[in-house]
């Protein structure tokens, strides 16, 4: 372990080179974490905001945006340094053109694969929807077109031979979806959130709601086309009296930009793992972290993160 003086000396050197990607205000470097307030990644941003300044002299700010789909753009265009991005979204943004970019976002880099977020498919019991194939011809809420939830829902449907058009998609916030479900204006809704999710709990509080499982056979078909989706489950009883529900999950990647200084990203990565118990107290999904899997990024690792993982392997 380096001495405290050397630690801070190295961090000051690292941050001194952060003119473009890390904003300076009153000579104090600012690391911006992209987030949507009230959404699933906001608690992690708040937890990092508490911990990172204790390890190096920088101020962590939340860079607010209206849509989680903006995270990639904020990082790629230099308006944020860190964000939590779904692995499927990160891979698509890095390898191909997307709706907001005519060319791949090749400046994206991975820091750590952290935890899995389940996809929730909820339907009215009266709709007689029992599996994904029963969604054909139904009115299904996909939240916002272009959002990570819609992206994962679309990949899930395509994996079993359906398209979004097959399900008569409806675009609306989850809060509006609750009203539409009550009124019988829609039959089902795709949602995404770490369990227990306040939004999912609110939907499941509506009488007559049920989770629709996505079974192993369907997940195997989905993974054949979209390997970043995998099997996970919604624990029994956390939204009322329901059994454990099989579903699709997608991993969340802490991502950054390629021009962040190597030393800065090294210390961010190191701080993340040395402070993991504290972070997990503030953001329980981090308890899922598989320390043997954290570097399995679908896009290239940032050199600073790769340096941390190499050192970790050497000193284990």
PLM feature spans:
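Sec-dependent signal peptide recognition
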Residues: 2-10
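C-terminal motif of bacterial Sec signal peptides marking the signal peptidase cleavage site
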Residues: 15-17
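Bacterial signal peptide processing site
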Residues: 19-21
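N-terminal (or domain-start) structured segment
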Residues: 24-86, 101
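Bilobed "Venus flytrap"/periplasmic-binding protein-like clamshell domains
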Residues: 28-55, 117-183, 295, 299-304
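Acidic, polar ligand-binding/catalytic clefts
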Residues: 80-116, 126, 194-198
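Pocket-lining segment of extracytoplasmic ligand-binding domains
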Residues: 87-89, 97-98, 163-255, 259-260
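Segments of small-molecule ligand-sensing domains
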Residues: 245-316
């Amino acid at each position: 372990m380096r001495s405290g003086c050397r630690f801070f000396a190295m961090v000051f050197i690292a941050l001194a080179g952060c003119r473009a990607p890390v904003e300076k205000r009153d000579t104090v470097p600012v690391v911006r974490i992209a987030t949507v307030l009230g959404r699933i990644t906001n608690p992690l941003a708040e937890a990092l905001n508490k911990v990172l300044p204790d390890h190096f002299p920088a101020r962590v700010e939340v860079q607010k945006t209206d849509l989680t789909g903006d995270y990639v753009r904020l990082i790629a265009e230099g308006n944020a340094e860190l964000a939590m991005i779904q692995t499927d979204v990160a891979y698509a943004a890095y390898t191909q053109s997307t709706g907001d970019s005519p060319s791949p976002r090749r400046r994206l880099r991975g820091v750590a694969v952290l935890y899995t977020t389940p996809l929730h498919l909820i339907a009215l019991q009266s709709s007689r929807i029992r599996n994904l194939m029963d969604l054909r011809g139904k009115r299904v809420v996909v939240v916002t077109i272009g959002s990570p939830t819609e992206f994962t829902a679309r990949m899930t449907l395509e994996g079993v031979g359906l398209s979004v058009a097959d399900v008569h998609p409806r675009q609306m916030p989850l809060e509006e979806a609750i009203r539409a479900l009550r009124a019988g204006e829609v039959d089902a809704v795709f949602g995404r959130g770490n369990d227990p999710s306040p939004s999912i709990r609110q939907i499941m509080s509506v009488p007559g709601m049920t989770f629709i499982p996505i079974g192993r056979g369907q997940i195997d078909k989905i993974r054949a086309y979209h390997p970043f989706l995998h099997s996970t489950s919604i624990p029994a009883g956390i939204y009322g009296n329901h059994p454990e529900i099989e579903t699709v999950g997608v991993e969340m990647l802490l991502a950054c930009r390629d021009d962040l200084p190597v030393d800065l990203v090294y210390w961010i990565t190191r701080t993340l793992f040395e402070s993991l118990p504290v972070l997990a107290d503030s953001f329980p999904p981090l308890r899922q972290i598989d320390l043997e899997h954290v570097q399995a990024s679908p896009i290239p690792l940032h050199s600073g993160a790769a340096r941390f993982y190499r050192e970790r392997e050497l000193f284990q």
